[in-house]
């Protein structure tokens, strides 16, 4: 009998560990999270870090959200031992900011130092992440709460380094190296990530399935954790049928 895999979650741009207790539909699995290291400025270095986090696992499912999805893609293209499935939410294989105005604003805001970083840069970033569905989610989330998430978890140096990493990485030519079942979770409402990002993943990864979660935005892992986790659960039950899972 195959032993159950561990679900390993990779943080978003904030670097903050996941709130695993909110993912109640996944309670049958062992869950693991982490905090992203500070100031790394390339995705391969982040992938090296995550590889170190799973070195003790015989079987694992990698779940990456947004910036974390880019990291998960980088690791998955290496054919790492033990990886049995991949989940990417709000993810991208190359520079996700295709709107030139949004990119210009983010770049300009990144030059603001000290208190201006918190007051202006993070305020604009929170606005870019927010959706009309956040305040009515299973866990309501305001723009000020999104901004506070970054204030508490993302030093300016790390913000700038992660921007550099996200803008410079390009895995479009390596997506066909991913040989495990892959779920692409896409929010119904998205302003930050370019609209073609999910399509590129679906078309580039050989065994990919896309699920669009209605009435959700980019922060759906935070605002709709039960809906989000249910989609993952259904995917794993369909694709990892040989696992011993207590229901």
Model-based region annotation:
Residues 2-40:
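Conserved HGGG/HGGXW glycine-rich cap/lid loop of the alpha/beta-hydrolase fold
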Residues 22, 171, 180, 194-203:
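Short alpha-helix in the alpha/beta-hydrolase fold that links the catalytic acid
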Residues 64-68, 72:
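Gly/Ala-rich beta-loop-alpha elbow adjacent to hydrolase catalytic centers
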Residues 77, 82, 86-115:
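Flexible "cap/lid" loop of the alpha/beta hydrolase fold
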Residues 97-99, 118-176:
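Conserved alpha/beta-hydrolase catalytic His-Asp/Glu region
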Residues 178, 184-186:
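Short beta-strand/loop motif that positions the catalytic acidic residue
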Residues 189-193:
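Acidic catalytic loop of the alpha/beta-hydrolase fold
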Residues 216-229:
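Catalytic histidine-centered segment of alpha/beta-hydrolase-like enzymes
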């Amino acid at each position: 009998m195959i032993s159950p895999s561990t679900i390993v979650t990779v943080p978003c741009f904030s670097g903050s560990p996941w709130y695993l207790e909110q993912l109640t539909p996944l309670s049958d699995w062992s869950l693991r999270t982490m905090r992203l290291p500070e100031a790394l400025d390339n995705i391969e270095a982040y992938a090296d870090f995550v590889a170190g986090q799973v070195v003790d696992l015989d079987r694992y499912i990698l779940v990456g959200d947004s910036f974390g999805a880019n990291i998960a893609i980088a690791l998955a293209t290496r054919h790492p031992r033990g990886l049995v499935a991949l989940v990417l939410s709000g993810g991208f294989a190359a520079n996700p900011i295709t709107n030139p105005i949004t990119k210009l604003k983010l770049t300009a805001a990144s030059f603001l130092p000290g208190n201006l970083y918190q007051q202006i840069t993070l305020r604009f970033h929170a606005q870019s992440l927010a959706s009309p569905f956040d305040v009515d989610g299973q866990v309501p989330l305001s723009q000020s709460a999104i901004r506070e998430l970054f204030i508490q978890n993302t030093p300016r140096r790390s913000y700038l380094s992660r921007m550099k990493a996200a803008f410079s990485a390009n895995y479009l030519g390596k997506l066909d190296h991913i040989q495990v079942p892959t779920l692409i979770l896409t929010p119904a409402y998205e302003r930050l990530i370019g609209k073609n990002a999910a399509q590129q993943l679906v078309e580039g990864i050989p065994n990919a399935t896309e699920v669009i979660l209605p009435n959700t935005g980019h922060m759906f892992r935070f605002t709709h954790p039960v809906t989000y986790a249910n989609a993952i659960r259904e995917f794993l039950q369909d694709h990892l049928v040989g696992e011993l899972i207590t229901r």
